[in-house]
């Protein structure tokens, strides 16, 4: 097995994104914040924006359902950059070290409306040979079609690719398509995991 291409997810692997970074300054208690994020402005709701739904439509839908939280819902996208704390520096350093030795690609579930902010504000994105953004394609992981789109667009062979993601469902989908994979958890040392692939 020869790895030629390394494919990175962004959130949870290279970037520290969490809605709590915004809402911990909005709600008085963690209990209120967690209720809002677990039951109202949920990750499932946000995933539809990653799939291509507009921020305006998503906000209006939720405000109509929960008018008592109208102000807090509006903040989700108007103050979105606050959720992006910054890079996961040790992994970004690994990415920089891989540049020039491997073909590097990004495969991310990210809204087409907010991804440009990150792309313009973090220089490491320029290291990638190509990036597939779910919101631009109207497809999200773990749908196998977005993995196939990546392979087709950049003429890649899955068995020569190493896919790195923090979501196990996304990892399972990639494995089913013959990608090599690394699942990044809270205790994962990415450098050690790469060494298992002689990288």
Residue locations for each model-derived region?
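A structural alpha-helix within SAM-dependent methyltransferase catalytic domains
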Residues: 96-99, 151
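Alpha-helical structural context
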Residues: 25-26, 65, 101, 121, ...
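Asp-based, Mg2+/Mn2+-dependent phosphohydrolase catalytic module
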Residues: 1-4, 111-112, 119-199
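Generic structural signal for small/hydrophobic residues in well-ordered secondary structure
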Residues: 9-12, 52, 98, 106, ...
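N-terminal helical cap/lid subdomain that shapes the substrate entry/recognition surface
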Residues: 2-89, 93, 100, 111-114
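A generic structural motif
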Residues: 101-103, 179
